[in-house]
């Protein structure tokens, strides 16, 4: 039988997967460079790193280093998504999303569920209407 701690870890990973899936689905539907699986993996990975960092005990342990390393790693991942085509830069929004999803995952991992859910909601409120507004602006040009 699973302990309370193990159940909490599974719940955190499941919450991270759902939040990552919600944001990733929007990218997937618009055929963007990083789809739903990538978004879920980033969110779950960040959550797991947060869980591990909060579980480490000791006087010489600086758990904030793990969170900063996650941000650094996501920066490299995001850099691989951004590219220039003619006079346009592509993948910038997707890279920014992955960066925010890592923060959402870290929030879930340390138990800041409200913050993670609120941030996911705000991200979706920016992405969905934002795409519609962008199309309208481009039509007027």
Give the location of each predicted region.
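Alpha-helical transmembrane segments and their membrane-interface boundaries
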Residues: 1-66, 109-118, 128-141
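Hydrophobic transmembrane alpha-helices of secondary-active transporters
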Residues: 18-23, 75-83, 105
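Short, amphipathic, aromatic/basic-enriched membrane-interface segments that mark the entry/exit
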Residues: 32-37, 60, 82-93
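Small-residue-rich segments of transmembrane alpha-helices in multi-pass membrane proteins
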Residues: 41-51, 72-76, 96-109
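Alpha-helical transmembrane-segment detector that highlights a single hydrophobic TM helix
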Residues: 59-87
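Interhelical loops and loop-helix junctions of multi-pass membrane transporters/channels
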Residues: 63-67, 92-93, 97-99
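Alpha-helical transmembrane segments and their membrane-interface exit regions
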Residues: 73-78, 123-132
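Membrane-helix boundary connector in multi-pass membrane proteins
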Residues: 86-88, 102-116
């Amino acid at each position: 039988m699973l302990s309370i701690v193990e159940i909490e870890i599974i719940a955190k990973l499941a919450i991270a997967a759902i939040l990552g899936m919600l944001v990733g689905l929007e990218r997937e539907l618009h055929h963007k460079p990083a789809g739903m699986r990538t978004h879920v993996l980033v969110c779950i990975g960040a959550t797991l790193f947060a869980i591990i960092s909060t579980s480490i005990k000791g006087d010489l342990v600086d758990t904030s280093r793990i969170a900063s390393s996650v941000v650094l790693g996501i920066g490299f991942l995001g850099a691989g998504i951004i590219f220039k085509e003619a006079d346009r830069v592509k993948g910038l929004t997707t890279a920014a999303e992955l960066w925010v999803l890592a923060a959402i995952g870290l929030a879930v991992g340390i138990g800041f569920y409200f913050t993670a859910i609120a941030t996911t909601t705000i991200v979706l409120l920016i992405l969905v209407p934002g795409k519609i507004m962008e199309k309208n602006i481009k039509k007027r040009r």
